[in-house]
Amino acid sequence: MKREKRTYREMWGKMISFFMYDGMKKDEYATIQGEIYEKNLRNMTIYSSVSAFLFLGLYISSYLIDSIIGNRFLYLIQFIVSFLVMCAFRTIAQNHRAAGESVKYIFEVSLLSFGIVLGAIKSPEAEAAVFIVLLVIIPMMLYDVLLFSVLIRATMIIVYVVIALQTKDMGYCSLT
């Protein structure tokens, strides 16, 4: 009986280590945490800058291309969010680690929300690829994927599936 309890504790400890400290021991993770934060900050600054310019380009293109005119408001909102996140990464996040982590998660949620609105609400059958691509790309930009980030993605997947199933039953809706 003692051996089973110890085995479960060891397994639980390994799971916690994997999700909380990226598979390392707590002290090993603590030694490289500053470097990870700097690399994540650099990557998220680049990613939010590219995202802001991409959404600005899509917003401008929506005046020229009739097929994306219905998403103009979404592009504008996501451009504003991406621009504000870019500014936050370049200013506030440089000096305040907690603020930088919060902004990182806010940016992740905003991108996944954009994918949900575009994919699940606007047309669940045709544009689900946007949400899936964002689910794949966002973790590739980070050096460590902690438990909170995994929980955000799991929650957004559940929200996406529920909304997609409901809008599929009700028919498509338009946000414009």
Model-derived regions, located:
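Hydrophobic transmembrane alpha-helices and their membrane-interface boundaries in multi-pass
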Residues: 47-137, 156-161
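Intrinsic low-complexity, intrinsically disordered segments enriched in polar/basic residues
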Residues: 2-5, 26, 39-42, 81-85, ...
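N-terminal membrane topogenic signal
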Residues: 36-48
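Non-catalytic regulatory/interaction regions at protein termini and inter-domain linkers
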Residues: 1-35
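Generic hydrophobic, helix-prone segments enriched in Leu/Val/Ile
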Residues: 29-39, 117-122
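N-terminal membrane insertion elements
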Residues: 2-5, 9-13, 135, 140-176
